[in-house]
């Protein structure tokens, strides 16, 4: 591992992200909280914050390019950017909706959680739907649209991150243990979010604790994304899975009320438990069923 190169990448990724955080702070934060009355939402502020968050997703890609140019190396060589579709693409993309619904179930087991299909947010979401459309129809549509978005627009934005986290960093950690690499990559990925988390992104009710929570989430999600990236031989599936996640992870907000961003949802404790169980299941499959052991191997 080239430590100087890694530090250069981190600086290129983190410093502009601080700028995004400052810009978000100047407009008053990320916008609405999880329990904010829809009538009180500042639409302009929320849209600007969303645009800043979306733009931030390309900062890791820029950091990779600038780092490679600094060290006079081919910009995207060896990062496994290919579109050779195989079964791992399909399994990876479909795994995210399964994990999302498992997280909803886990959230409902948390203290104070209540299944609430009459929440104002749910009723707003149902407006404009054909008569007779209920909660499960909305969830189904959300899942399908999330999958489509993950393959298209969301996947494109997620690629801006994944080319760094599951592309560049995997290459830099070549020869290191899989889980060691996952721990370091997840920590870097999580802390990179800090400037926008502190401004209310993902954890609007607990922005300071949210920095720690987001880091834990990224550490737990990273082995799963790395596993599918390694099995598929392409960083693209990591971008698709990341994109699908971004498209459907908010389903918990629709059906659980009042919402606690530290306990419920994909980035709360319920999500952590779900991801931990998923990691254990993949590890057991990898260790006892698969012919190719990745979790216990070195990054090649």
Predicted features and spans:
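C-terminal membrane module of polytopic membrane proteins
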Residues: 207-208, 233, 241-300
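Residue-level signature of the transmembrane alpha-helical core
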Residues: 10, 14, 58, 93-97, ...
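Hydrophobic transmembrane alpha-helices of multi-pass small-molecule transporters
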Residues: 21, 61, 194-197, 246-251, ...
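Membrane-interface helix/loop boundary segments of multi-pass membrane proteins
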Residues: 159-188, 230-234
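N-terminal membrane topogenic signal
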Residues: 1-11
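Hydrophobic alpha-helical membrane-insertion segments
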Residues: 12-21, 90-107, 226-238
């Amino acid at each position: 591992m080239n430590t100087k190169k890694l530090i250069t990448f981190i600086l290129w990724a983190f410093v502009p992200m601080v700028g995004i955080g400052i810009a978000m702070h100047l407009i008053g934060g990320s916008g609405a909280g999880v329990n904010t009355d829809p009538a009180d939402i500042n639409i302009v502020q929320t849209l600007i914050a969303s645009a800043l968050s979306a733009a931030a997703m390309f900062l890791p890609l820029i950091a990779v390019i600038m780092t490679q140019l600094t060290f006079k190396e081919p910009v995207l060589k060896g990062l496994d950017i290919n579109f050779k579709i195989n079964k791992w693409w399909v399994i990876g993309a479909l795994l995210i909706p399964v994990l999302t619904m498992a997280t909803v179930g886990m959230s409902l087991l948390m203290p104070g959680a209540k299944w609430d299909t009459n929440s104002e947010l749910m009723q707003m979401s149902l407006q404009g739907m054909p008569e007779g459309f209920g909660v499960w129809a909305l969830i189904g549509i959300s899942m399908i649209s999330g999958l489509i978005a993950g393959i298209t627009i969301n996947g494109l934005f997620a690629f801006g991150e994944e080319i760094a986290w599951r592309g560049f960093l995997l290459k830099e950690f070549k020869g290191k243990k899989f889980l060691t690499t996952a721990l370091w990559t997840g920590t870097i990925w999580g802390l990179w979010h800090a400037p926008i988390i502190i401004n209310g992104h993902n954890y609007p009710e607990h922005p300071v604790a949210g920095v720690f929570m987001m880091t834990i989430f990224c550490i737990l999600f990273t082995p799963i994304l790395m596993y599918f990236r390694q099995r598929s031989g392409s960083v693209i599936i990591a971008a698709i899975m990341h994109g699908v996640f971004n498209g459907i992870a908010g389903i918990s907000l629709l059906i659980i009320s009042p919402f606690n961003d530290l306990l419920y949802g994909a980035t709360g404790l319920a999500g952590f438990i779900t991801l931990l169980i998923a990691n254990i299941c993949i590890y057991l499959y990898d260790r006892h069923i698969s012919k190719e052991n990745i979790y216990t191997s070195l990054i090649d």
